[in-house]
Amino acid sequence: MNTVMKTIGLAAALTLSAIPAFAESVLKLAHAAPETDLQQTMSTYFKEQIEARSGGSIKVNIFPHGQLGNDAQMIDGARSGIIDIAISGLNNFTGLIPEAGAFELPFMFPSRDLAYKILDGEIGQGVAAKFEPVGLKLLGFPENGYRNITNNRGPVHTPEDLSGLQMRVNNSKALNDMFALVGANPQQLPVAELYTALETGVVDAQDHPIGIVVSFKFNEVQKYLSLTQHAYSALAMVMNIDKLKGLSDAEQKIITDVAAEAVAKQRELSLAKEEEMITELESQGMTVNRDVDAAAFQTAVKPVWEGFIDENGDSLVNAIVAASK
């Protein structure tokens, strides 16, 4: 009897082993923003749609708020394959793709519609192609929105109002040069360290889009918000290119289709919620200044454009300007 049972058991085991295991890919998606930010909203939409449309063959695990490292570490992780998908400010990619710095130049995009037209069109896709040689596939350009200045000294009406301020800046050369030109003292700090730096007075001021001010609660340690809108801040959603190519053609299409939808929805929410967030900041005691001399700022920062052109040539800047007309 034991021999019979063993034979039956072996036959059953062989039969089960002949059935292929359900193929499942698990993707790690990382970003640096808090869970209250629209980057998390976008990531959640991406996760839900990918898992539903793939029939469960692709799972997405989200790691917000820098859980897998700061922006530089996340980008390195995505290139090496430790992280599958990362969302980060486009400025964080300019070391790898200097041309992307053209999109970061102050006052490059007078409107969101123009920014979307350029980023989603031939010019943006030309830059997107440059991500592939560094191991990344660009899935889309979500947004942080227009950058504005907060500080504790007073409203910023003209470039002169920034003179002497200890100004936190990101790693964008254009923004570093801009604030140095107008007399501020730019200091690079990771965004994760910024709240404490503002609270303790290590820096006096910073610039971020409204959504980031709200998400990171900078209004708790900053009194004044001036709507300078001095630079449009795009994000880049990237995927390890080998991981993407390792999926089936159908799965790759699901990834790219859903990413495009997620970017569009995130942009729509970003615009729709901006005034609501400004009102929220005012209600919490922040003084909001809308009286900004944009023309004076544009004149003051012209050398930033010239510096970029000296280093990278004028073809991309000229193409953007021509497409803007």
What are the language-model segments listed below?
Residues E24-L114, E122-Q125, A129-K325:
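N-terminal secretory/targeting leader peptides
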Residues L10-A11, A21:
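Cleavable N-terminal signal peptides
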Residues S17-A23:
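Sec/Tat signal peptide C-region and signal peptidase I cleavage site
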Residues M1-G9:
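Bacterial N-terminal signal peptides that target proteins for export
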